[in-house]
């Protein structure tokens, strides 16, 4: 998905401000770094319960990872997948706002990708570093 597609999809959910942040790799699309296949959300417990009542399906991806899924979305109540596990309020305090949608900062995405260390994360770390270098030089 491109920047416009991510923004359109998130806006279509009509979620209450400050009850979620777009995390995972989705900030890449908004910054024009690369397209993404899905949209990860870190949501408040209250919003999680509302989404569950709306029919979002709970899946089990591991001991601490039981997101709700709908269409291209995964809604998580925690980001406890690596040694970097920020809270919703921490991420919101450093967010990037695009068209009134809160996206995790590139610095937060970088910390998570570095802590995760999967092969795809290492590729993304290089993309982040190249993007940041181009911003400082441009």
Label every PLM stretch briefly.
Residues 1-138:
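Compositionally biased terminal segments of proteins
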């Amino acid at each position: 998905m491109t920047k416009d597609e991510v923004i359109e999809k998130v806006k279509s959910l009509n979620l209450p401000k400050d009850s979620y942040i777009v995390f995972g790799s989705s900030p890449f699309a908004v910054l024009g770094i690369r397209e993404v296949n899905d949209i990860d959300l870190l949501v408040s417990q209250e919003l999680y319960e509302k989404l569950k009542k709306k029919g979002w399906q709970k899946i089990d991806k591991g001991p601490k990872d039981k997101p709700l899924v709908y269409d291209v979305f995964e809604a998580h109540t925690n980001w406890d997948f690596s040694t970097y596990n920020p809270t919703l309020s921490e991420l919101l305090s450093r967010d990037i706002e695009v068209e009134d949608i809160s996206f995790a900062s590139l610095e937060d995405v970088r910390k998570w990708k570095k802590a995760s260390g999967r092969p795809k994360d290492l590729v993304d770390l290089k993309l982040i570093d190249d993007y940041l270098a181009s911003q400082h030089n441009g």
